[in-house]
Amino acid sequence: MAPLTLDEKDLLHRGIRHLMVDSLQPRDLTDEAALKNPPDISDFLNTALKVDVQKLLSASFNIARAIDLEMLLEWKDNLDQFSLFHEGWIIEPKGDITYVYTRHGLMIVGGTGDNVYEQDALLIVDLGGNDRYLNGAGASRIGHPFSMVIDFSGDDVYLSGADHAQGAGILGGGFLIDLGGDDRYLAENFAQGAGVLGVGMLIDTGGRDEYRCHSFCQGAGFLGVGLIAESGGNDQYHAAVYAQGFGFIRGLGLMLEGAGDDRYFAGGIYPDYREPGKAYLSMSQGFGYGIRPWGDLAGASGGIGILDDARGNDQYLGDYFSQGAGYWYGLGILNDSAGHDLYTAGRYSQGAGIHLAAGILTDASGDDHYLARYGVSQGCGHDLAVGFLLDNGGNDRYIGGTLSQGAGNGNGFGVLSDNGGNDEYYLRDQGQGHGNTETFRRLDSFGILFDTGGGKDRYSLGGHNNKVNLHPQWGIQADLP
């Protein structure tokens, strides 16, 4: 990290908190004029650029690569063959927990009992039991750039009422690894796989788990990398905003789910100004977000947000800006590889690129249902942006309002492609292969709906089986055998 003064470190912490939490009000978060409150965003971004992010990420990834799960399990099963402690360390046993004081920081080793951890440490290793973590649980902070928790087994509860918890890398690296059990993770902001000028990881290898947090969590990256990875079990994820595969400025947010019938929810707290009392911001579930220049406000290109679910019958519940969407040079991807899935959203979702961005939703198989209540979704590109919804099989149903199902607007490019099955497409207007004309850039918009692989399909706007329709204003609706 480049040398930073205490004032600069304080500015970074306040700026991060302001952008991701304090600026959250019942108003439009895409109206960047509302973000011109102190701390000054330009000062914050210029200070952040002083940090050697590449060096910081390299150090964190070297640690991550050294975390071999098979090695950890072998280590647990053969503790008597390993030397846990080194000369010069101060060892302080207290019941089932041993405190180890080293020149690098505190390490804690817990036995197989039901332990309670309230103190943060450089490293916590728990060998089993139904434990409670009331601390940061693998969260770095100023003055403590690294922290790791490894819990081998048990039905554990991770509870934090403060920011930065449960696998959070803030100006450093934070890692939380849970190797089994039905666990509950409850946190506020910057948690559950969150990286800001650092790397944050939460890895859970199995069980029926529950994750709840507020903002910037569950795989969120901002000038860093945030990762949450689950290998199996029927899991539940609940967040308010900026979560579940969210990438902000120069950030990568990853949410990886291996198997199980999972439920993802994001939204319900902050109303969107376009439909007060009816719609809420999600900014989650594979969403890349940047700051659009507004007046004298500094702009910054968005990051990359990815949600990848390998298999299971899953439910994705979001509202505005969700489910494979990008805003202002951001890239958002939601990929589901197998299962009969339900996607529910409001607007700017389900493969939507908004303002020079890209949004992609791909579903490889299963009988799926897609609902975008207002629209501007389901393969929509708006304002020099691209949006793709790609479904590779199954009997699917698409329901939207307007500007959806292969729609381009404001010089955008939108595609919905469905390969195989008996599919149904319902839309009010401006879609199913529709491009609006915008003359101020001397460019056109393009909208394409492809349905291939045969099947008996239904279209609300006049499409027919085994026929290609060329729509006015650069639109194509093609149903091919």
Annotate each predicted stretch with a short phrase.
Residues 1-111, 480-481:
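Terminal non-domain segments
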Residues 73-146, 157-161, 316:
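N-terminal targeting and processing segments
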Residues 105-110, 121-127, 144-153, 168-179, ...:
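Well-ordered beta-strand segments characteristic of repetitive beta-sheet solenoids
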Residues 114-117, 130-137, 157-162, 182-190, ...:
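Beta-strand-rich extracellular passenger or scaffold domains
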Residues 164-167, 193, 218-219, 240-246, ...:
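Acidic/polar low-complexity surface segments
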Residues 299-303:
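Extended HEAT/HEAT-like alpha-solenoid repeat tracts in very large eukaryotic scaffold/adaptor proteins
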Residues 390, 397-464:
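Ankyrin-repeat and related helical/solenoid repeat scaffolds used for protein-protein interactions
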Residues 457-481:
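Blade-level signature of beta-propeller repeat domains, shared across WD40, Kelch, NHL, RCC1
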